[in-house]
Amino acid sequence: MKRIKTSEDLQELHKRALEKKKERFVSISSGTCGQARGSQKIVDAFEKEAKGKIDIKITGCHGFCEAEPNIILFPEGIFYQHLKPEDVEGIVENTIILGKIIDKHLYKDPESGKPYIYQQDIPFYKVQKRHLLGNNPFIDPTNIDDYLAMDGYLSLAKALKISQDEIIENIKNAGLRGRGGAGFPTGKKWEMARKQAVSCQPSAVSYIICNADEGDPGAYMDRSLLEGNPHSVIEGMIIGAYAIGANEGWIYVRNEYPLAVKNVSIAIEQARELGFLGKDILGSGFDFDIRIARGAGAFVCGEETALIQSIEGKRGSPKQRPPYPVEKGLFGKPTNINNVETWANISQIIDKGAEWFSSIGTGTSKGTKIFSLVGKVKNTGLVEVPMGMTLREVIFDVGGGIPDGKKFKAVQTGGPSGGCIPEKLLDLPVDYDSLTKVGSIMGSGGMIVMDENTCMVDVAKYFLTFLQDESCGKCLSCRKGIQKMLEIVTDITEGKGKEEDLETLKDLAYVVKDTSLCGLGQTAPNPVL
């Protein structure tokens, strides 16, 4: 690949990528979820049966995980689901060559039986606003040309022509909040990091980190973004580094995400070869590069200071704050940390403007949010909806409701740190403030649906077991407190509980909450409170 040195070079590269773009192709969903359901066999079958007849694009997750393995035939948008390798020959002969729809491969409404031919008409997709996930079916994550054809890196070129302060002001005006759980305003965080970088000597090193340590049970939003559209995250990081004044970046991703690691590694190398990473990016004089750090999968390493310890080669355990990472972070240098989804939003804000982004969502929760909708729901998968959509709309309109005629009982949001929201609150808007008011959190985006047969005490026991295993053990209150709470809850599930156990459990929960150092311990009692 020829290294591009100017915005004009990028425009020419973008033009060539558009010329290569095929209007007619089959998009095969091949993220981790698809591969677990046999998508590679579908890929092999298409390469055998359809070679020379249609362009084959192996992509990240299409979102509708319940329908895996699935494909989309473009430009029509024909959606076929639950495919087997032996189905491919018929699809090539009938649909690709003759234009005939094969009814048995279509998605059918679980209640009415109505078949849907086109992806955009399926209720699971129709209700969503897929600003981040919508590009996945069009992008082979190992081919940078696909990203360039979707206006990739044009936002970077635009950002490099304006001042760092102007970029930060755009992010602030957009109202973007961190998508990793805490919901801290991203623009404010960048502003603090920028001031810290400016106050240091010009030669001083500062860092940015992409936190891809996604540890909540049932959550896989970040994994799917990295697998399906890694360049969107990389572009956001480059823009952020330029705005803040950082010159080195890290993507911290757990080693149990091998496909994400593979696709991000390829994307970084391609970006480096073309000049989006390295020295003098697009002739701007700005130098920046990204490295990957693989985590061992410890849940506590999602906490910023523990993550930093892990990158430094130390045991991943939280440190007391202040100083905060923005002041003294990685290797003792100023460090700004955002999660995968936050970084992926940056290029869209630069491209479409702060006003466009802030027009989506609610007063204090702007933009869209990706959720992994799992559990006792008909349409499991990745959903991207505007902030402020109600739980009822997400679970019943997008998710299709509860299977087997069962009744809805509760939905757990925010992972182990979150809470369970009962049926009476189904019309609650899904935004940061509304979820916090009812004792839960947005978290990174996990959403576990439970039906009438789910025992809530068993749910509490499950999360306490998880948290006991994942606690770093540094704080006595967390280490022993979670253990004791789990013992009490276990006794209750085994019929050995006593009435006074409930008061003991409540008192113990508040001690753990109030005396633990990091977010894991501070929110560990949530499953029982």
Language-model region placement:
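Hydrophobic alpha-helical positions that pack around
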Residues: 127-128, 261-387, 399
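Short, basic, low-complexity termini and linkers enriched in Ser/Thr/Gly/Pro
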Residues: 196-205
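Accessory "access/gating" subregions that flank catalytic or transport cores
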Residues: 156-196, 358-359, 364, 372, ...
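Ferredoxin-type iron-sulfur electron-transfer modules in oxidoreductases and energy-metabolism complexes
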Residues: 2-24, 39-60, 75-104, 154-170, ...
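Conserved phosphate/anionic-ligand binding catalytic regions in large, soluble enzymes, centered on
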Residues: 30-38, 171-193, 297-309, 313, ...
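Short amphipathic, charge-patterned alpha-helical segments
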Residues: 236-240, 388-403
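Fe-S ferredoxin-like electron-transfer domains
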Residues: 77-173, 277, 306, 310, ...
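Histidine-anchored nucleotide/phosphate-binding helix
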Residues: 229-243
